[in-house]
C-alpha cells in the first residue's frame, strides 16, 4: 500500500466565519497573504507551528481546521 496522506483544511471557511480577509489573517499570524492563499488552495502545507498559530487565531481545534484526505 503506497498511499500518500494529504493534509487538507477548512481554513477559508474558518476565516470567513471570523470575517477576516486573507491579508488580516496573515498579519495576525505573521506570514504573507500569499502563504495564507497557498494553504487555502492546498499548494502549501503549513508547519506544525503555523498550523497551531492559525488554530489559535481562528479559535479552532486542530482537527476542526485540518484533516487528512
Question: Where do the model's predicted regions map?
Answer:
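Residues within the helices of the helix-turn-helix
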Residues: 12, 23, 52
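Residue-level signal for the short linker/turn that defines the boundary of a DNA-recognition helix
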Residues: 9, 19-20, 46-49
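Short alpha-helical DNA-recognition segment
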Residues: 20-38
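Short, charged recognition helix plus adjacent turn
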Residues: 1-2, 67-69
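DNA major-groove recognition helix of helix-turn-helix/homeodomain DNA-binding modules
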Residues: 49-64
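Short, conserved catalytic or interaction motifs in soluble domains
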Residues: 41
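A short, Lys/Arg-rich alpha-helix, primarily the initiator
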Residues: 1-17
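The alpha-helix within a helix-turn-helix
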Residues: 15, 26, 55
Amino acid at each position: 500500500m503506497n498511499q500518500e496522506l494529504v493534509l487538507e483544511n477548512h481554513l477559508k471557511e474558518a476565516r470567513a466565519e471570523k470575517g477576516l480577509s486573507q491579508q488580516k489573517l496573515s498579519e495576525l499570524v505573521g506570514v504573507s497573504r500569499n502563504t495564507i492563499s497557498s494553504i487555502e488552495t492546498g499548494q502549501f502545507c503549513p508547519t506544525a507551528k503555523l498550523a497551531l498559530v492559525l488554530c489559535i487565531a481562528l479559535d479552532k481545534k486542530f482537527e476542526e481546521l485540518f484533516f487528512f484526505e
